[in-house]
């Protein structure tokens, strides 16, 4: 014996995707902690995650939110590392991030860090599960943080719907409990009961945080033996308390909770019908996953489906069907249908049609064939799965380890269906009975009967029994001939082959393979990931794009009409790993198609042909126009971040339209206008395109040529090709634009503090801006969020508003927006003094961390494609921008950086160009702080017109001067 902690090797290796070149070893430490070690010699970042098999369902009823509070306070220092910011500072100085979440049955903690800093991060991470301090002085602050997190969800319909599922459940069930926690449940209630919340938290931690119900994943470059030694050394001290995994015998729904309908008025302007079925637990049925299979059929959107029939009748626009595991013994299936006005009026007919389809499922003998298609695609997706960022992989796999999968096939069985289980499928279908569901009907027009109020979200709702005669009619329903099971899926790929060739010199950027008056085509044959997939982007650039608000909403409506017309055709493609999206751009319409190359060309040609041949059906037009009008109205209920983001874009770009302008414009868009509009939009087009993946240059040319021929446009003159420009904020400019939140129930205000720095082609300023964000992000978070408790959402980011690079600070809070701006100014004052005191070592660490981030390799094809397309769309075509800026960062001195900060970021800087967007809650309008030397923007359009426009974004080099020798590493 050498004194090392004992380790049991459970299994070497895992069944993995074809392209997964990592090494795996599953071990168990002497304290019963199961650890999956993953060696990835190519990873830039290392990671670890611990999943604890305890979540919100284990909260004591007198301390709701305690598990979530534990997740928060756990990070506030340990005996070995008592500084509450030590962990975060270590990660930030090594290009790291961390996060955690509390779910109903588990709590998951994870981090990512530069590969060479893994041991130090593991040491700090392990201490949270060995000897956390749960500092008394942090207690109240973190209760407020939990409360702030809850407050940000108060006006979220998704959170409110989920809470209603709980409210309508069996009151004896753990599912009925409020999970998040707030200042009442963690502050006021414990005081009233004479409870010390910190002492109760210590009891909770001591009772449940045991090594035997934890799962750990470690990903690093080091050999497995080294990772194993680190795991044993650092994590064996976690105590094993032999804790049993909690069981929850009370069912979430009994006969008392079904056959009811709940009426609720949502925050957003939506019309939604949720049908919820309690079903037997599916936890142990991972080989077939019967409920998942049944949801696949209920949520199908192809020919003969429930949704297709509803759409043909003008009753619905979309739906989603899903199952949720509530406890080990109980699941629910939810069919959530988004209704038209007619569907809302006749919602009982919608329910009847659902039960017609369920009857079809009950009578069919085709499940084996349909299941086999699903199984084939799950296998294909698993075999061709690419890597994801290390932290994403670690925390997902850690939660999967909690399941009872065979230990050498944890990754496989969590992804692939393997066994057809007709009895299991029938058991689920038989649970979808007319006497075994409850409904939630939500719409803005619902006013009467909302005589119940939910305590924690303030949801007003009504509840009544479903009519017994209606239930009886569902028991004797017959299936319409319009409903039938899915046909054979023509998009299932036959070939998953990739001709993998040795590559000595990898392509660094895409190659320009066609550039004429009709098409500019960039192509890169994948030489890194070797998957049988591709990503294709086409920007159909039109001279009339964004010409007016009416053109803008008409373009959006046109893309929606195409997607709607192709819904039944394209849905099977999505099941077979092929997806497309159409979205309006500042210059036209962008088509993105991604997936297996075997059938990608078929979908591409179908979509482009529909763009050309679309026949606008008046009923579908009115339904989709109404839906878009609802979305524009829902801007009033938009989260503060998205609202401020939209306003900043509108203020910055000459052809960006305000929500009010778009709302007014859509009123004038009529079905009779669309034919001429489509003709005008497509008459002159230039196709800017990128093909990246498992396609040769010849394949790429043929793909884009087919799109061009289908549209057959006239060329766009060079003078008609608009390029991106933005307003120039004058040096020394200090502007505030205020927008009041119309929703009177919204407690939160917010500020987007935006600093316009330089044009994107100014590489040195870009490097300095990124370094500023690197240095500022941790102190901004720890000061504004942790210490000052301004709000749950606090971040800094580098933002691109072409052609400019910007630095943003965002805070959402229950305090007023002027107070938030005053605290950001105080923060900048603090930075000003602290930068002078920063050691050379700390400055060097920040530079190294940023350089590591900027030089990170892409982890999958999508990441790489998205970066190329972003560089194409910004108009500079600078595919190596980050690499060049990384070189510049290495040369930046403290003096240069300090001068840059003082002149360009501090609010008194002579070159500082600042616009802050204030999103103002009506609940805190009275709290006003004076901001000196500021100009209030009273009228956004007049402000834009008074500003000088930037020069347009142009390629760094003329296209005919691109040197092919520079394309390679």
Curated annotation (Swiss-Prot):
GO cellular component assignments: cytosol; mitochondrion
GO annotation terms (biological process): meiotic cell cycle; mitochondrial protein processing; peptide catabolic process; proteolysis involved in protein catabolic process
Enzyme Commission identifier(s): 3.4.24.-
Active site: 71
Main location: cytoplasm
Top-level taxonomic group: Eukaryota
GO molecular function: metal ion binding; metalloendopeptidase activity
InterPro entries in alphabetical order: Metalloenz_LuxS/M16 (IPR011249), Pept_M16_N (IPR011765), Pept_M16_Zn_BS (IPR001431), Peptidase_M16 (IPR050626), Peptidase_M16_C (IPR007863), Peptidase_M16_M (IPR032632), PqqF-like_C_4 (IPR054734)
Keywords, alphabetical: Cytoplasm, Hydrolase, Meiosis, Metal-binding, Metalloprotease, Protease, Zinc
EC supergroup of this enzyme: hydrolase
Protein family membership: Belongs to the peptidase M16 family.
Descriptive protein name: Putative zinc protease mug138
UniProt organism field: Schizosaccharomyces pombe (strain 972 / ATCC 24843) (Fission yeast)
């Amino acid at each position: 014996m050498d004194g090392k902690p004992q380790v049991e090797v459970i299994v070497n290796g895992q069944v993995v995707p074809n392209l997964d070149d990592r090494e795996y070893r599953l071990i168990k430490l002497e304290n019963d902690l199961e650890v999956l070690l993953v060696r990835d010699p190519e990873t830039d970042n290392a990671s670890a995650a611990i999943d604890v098999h305890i979540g919100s369902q284990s909260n004591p009823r007198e301390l709701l939110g305690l598990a979530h509070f534990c997740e928060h306070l756990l990070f506030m220092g340990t005996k070995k590392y008592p500084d509450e910011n030590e962990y975060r500072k270590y990660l930030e100085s090594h290009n790291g991030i961390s996060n955690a979440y509390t779910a109903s049955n588990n709590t998951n903690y994870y981090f990512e860090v530069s590969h060479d800093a893994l041991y130090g991060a593991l040491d700090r991470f392990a201490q949270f599960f060995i000897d956390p301090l749960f500092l008394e002085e942090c207690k109240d602050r973190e209760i407020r943080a939990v409360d702030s997190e809850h407050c940000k969800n108060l006006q979220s319909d998704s959170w409110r719907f989920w809470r209603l599922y709980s409210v309508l459940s069996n009151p004896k069930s753990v599912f009925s409990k409020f999970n998040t926690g707030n200042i009442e449940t963690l502050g006021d209630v414990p005081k009233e009961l004479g409870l010390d919340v910190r002492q109760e938290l210590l009891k909770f931690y001591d009772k449940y945080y045991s090594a035997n119900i934890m799962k750990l994943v470690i990903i690093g470059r080091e050999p497995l033996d080294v990772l194993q030694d680190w795991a044993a050394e650092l994590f064996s001290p976690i105590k094993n308390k032999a804790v049993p995994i909690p069981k929850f015998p009370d069912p979430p729904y009994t006969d008392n909770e079904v056959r009811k309908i709940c009426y609720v008025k949502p925050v957003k302007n939506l019309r939604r019908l949720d049908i919820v079925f309690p079903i037997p637990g599916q936890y142990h049925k991972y080989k077939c996953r019967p409920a998942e299979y049944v949801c696949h059929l209920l949520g199908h959107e192809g020919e003969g489906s429930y949704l297709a029939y509803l759409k043909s009748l003008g009753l619905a626009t979309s739906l989603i069907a899903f199952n949720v595991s509530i406890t080990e013994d109980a699941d629910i299936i939810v069919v959530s249908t988004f209704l038209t006005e007619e569907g809302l009026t006749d919602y009982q007919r919608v329910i009847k049609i659902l039960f017609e389809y369920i009857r079809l499922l009950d009578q069919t003998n085709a499940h084996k064939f349909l299941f086999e298609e699903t199984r084939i695609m799950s296998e294909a997706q698993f075999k061709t799965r690419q890597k994801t960022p290390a932290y994403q992989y670690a925390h997902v796999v850690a939660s999967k380890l909690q399941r009872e999968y065979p230990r050498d096939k944890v990754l496989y069985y969590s992804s692939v269906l393997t066994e057809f289980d007709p009895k299991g499928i029938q058991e689920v279908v038989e649970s979808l009975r007319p006497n075994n569901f409850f409904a939630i009907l939500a719409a803005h027009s619902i006013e009467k009967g909302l005589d119940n109020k939910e305590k924690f979200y303030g949801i007003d709702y009504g509840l009544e029994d479903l009519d017994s005669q209606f239930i009886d009619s569902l028991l004797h329903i017959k299936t319409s001939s319009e409903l039938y099971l899915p046909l054979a899926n023509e998009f299932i790929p036959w070939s998953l082959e990739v001709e993998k060739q040795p590559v000595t010199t990898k392509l660094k950027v895409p190659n320009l393979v066609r550039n004429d008056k009709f098409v500019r085509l960039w192509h890169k044959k994948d030489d890194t990931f070797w998957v049988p997939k591709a990503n294709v982007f086409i920007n159909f650039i039109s001279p009339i794009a964004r010409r007016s608000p009416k053109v803008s909403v008409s373009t959006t409506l046109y893309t929606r009409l195409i997607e709607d017309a192709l819904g039944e055709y394209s849905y099977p493609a999505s099941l077979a790993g092929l997806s497309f999206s159409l979205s309006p751009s500042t210059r036209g319409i962008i088509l993105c198609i991604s997936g297996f190359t075997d059938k990608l060309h078929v979908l591409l040609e179908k979509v482009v042909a529909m763009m050309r041949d679309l026949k606008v059906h008046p009923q579908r037009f009115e339904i989709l126009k109404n839906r878009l009008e609802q979305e524009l109205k829902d801007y009033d209920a938009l989260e503060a971040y998205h609202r401020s983001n939209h306003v900043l874009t509108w203020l910055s770009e000459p052809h960006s339209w305000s929500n009010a302008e778009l709302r007014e414009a859509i009123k004038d868009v009529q079905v009779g206008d669309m034919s001429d509009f489509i003709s005008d939009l497509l008459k002159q087009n230039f196709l800017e395109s990128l093909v990246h993946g498992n396609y040769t240059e010849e394949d790429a040319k043929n793909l884009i040529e087919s799109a061009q021929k289908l549209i057959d446009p006239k060329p766009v003159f060079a003078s008609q090709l608009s390029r991106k420009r933005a307003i120039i904020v004058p040096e020394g400019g200090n502007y505030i634009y205020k927008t009041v939140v119309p929703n009177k129930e919204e407690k939160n205000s917010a500020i987007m503090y935006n600093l316009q720095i330089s044009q994107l082609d100014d590489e040195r300023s870009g490097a300095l801006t990124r370094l500023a964000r690197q240095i500022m992000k941790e102190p901004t978070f720890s000061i504004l969020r942790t210490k000052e408790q301004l709000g749950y959402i606090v971040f800094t980011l580098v933002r691109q508003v072409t052609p400019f690079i910007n630095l943003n600070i965002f805070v959402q809070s229950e305090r007023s927006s002027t107070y938030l701006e005053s605290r950001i100014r105080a923060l900048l004052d603090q930075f000003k003094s602290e930068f002078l005191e920063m050691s050379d070592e700390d400055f060097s660490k920040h530079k190294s961390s940023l350089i590591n981030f900027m030089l990170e390799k892409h982890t999958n094809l999508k990441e790489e494609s998205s970066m190329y397309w972003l560089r194409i769309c910004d108009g500079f075509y600078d595919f190596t921008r980050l690499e060049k800026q990384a070189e510049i960062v290495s040369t930046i001195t403290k003096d240069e950086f300090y001068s840059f900060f003082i002149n360009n970021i501090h609010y008194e800087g002579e070159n500082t160009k600042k616009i802050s967007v204030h999103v103002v809650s009506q609940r805190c309008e009275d709290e006003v702080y004076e901001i000196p030397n500021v100009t209030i923007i009273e009228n956004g359009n007049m402000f834009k017109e008074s500003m000088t426009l930037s020069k347009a974004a142009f390629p760094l080099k003329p296209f005919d001067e691109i040197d092919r020798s520079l394309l390679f590493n």
